[in-house]
Amino acid sequence: MKKKALLPLFLGIMIFLAGCDYSTPEKQDGFFFNTFVQPMKHLLQWLGNDVFHNNFGLAIIVLVLFIRLILLPFMLSNYKNSHMMREKMKVAKPEVDGIQEKVKRARTQEEKMAANQELMEVYKKYDMNPMKSMLGCLPILIQMPIIMGLYFVLKDKLVNGLSEHPHFLWFNLTKPDIWITVIAGVLYFIQAVVSSKTMPQEQRQMGYMMMVISPIMIIWISLQASSALGLYWSVSALFLVIQTHFANIYYSKLAKKEVQPFIEKYEREHNPSSKKKGKNTQVVSKKNKK
């Protein structure tokens, strides 16, 4: 799934959030309520009432960390694929650009198919799989129903005890708060900036668009809902900023190390002088041994 497909998805979610209502017992039924809203209600009640003794702010923070740990393997795989793809594309780019020019100049369907087949061979040679980029959307898709379930739990005040113990830090968890909303928006903007650093040049325009759309969407929804959702997003964004920063450092070094054999292979194939140089060094080393 390309990131462009996330825009209509976000619009559909906003329409869905605006249309659903679980505020009365007779409305609390159906697949979505029973699968996502009800479990989130029981989990938040257990954390807030039993584990943290009526501290629902801590309950939401722990809930965020729990969800982030579940998503961590998918996120790490995404970071690794992104860095590997970027480093390998640097090596393969001259060949890829040449084939893409062939595709543009192709006049028949057969010529286009032949050029595309040639492109697939280049991807195979450098062990590149563009389909892996689809996994980048997986954490978002997994998290969406969880966030939507939490949204309805908080919006319709379904958690027992939250109305009696709504305060955390300076804000009321059951009401909108402008400051926690702004914090959530700013942190998601920073997260988008940090993430965009690893994007290939051709994808950065979409990344810049998401930098604007994500914070605006989060601010808009947070202002319509209780500040508990703003707290959820703030903690989640802070976790993502830290996670992305350290993952970029680690996987950037790892990708450069693993791509080095492909660079050496490319130089041998496209720079004959490097082959001669390599042979000469081998001859010199043999003479020195003698």
Swiss-Prot record:
Keywords, sorted A to Z: Cell membrane, Chaperone, Lipoprotein, Membrane, Palmitate, Protein transport, Signal, Transmembrane, Transmembrane helix, Transport
Lipidation (N-palmitoyl cysteine): C20
Any Pfam family hit: 60KD_IMP
Membrane-spanning intervals of the chain: 56-76, 134-154, 176-196, 211-231, 232-252
Primary residence: membrane
BP-aspect Gene Ontology terms: protein insertion into membrane; protein transport
UniProt name for this protein: Membrane protein insertase YidC 2
Organism: Staphylococcus epidermidis (strain ATCC 35984 / DSM 28319 / BCRC 17069 / CCUG 31568 / BM 3577 / RP62A)
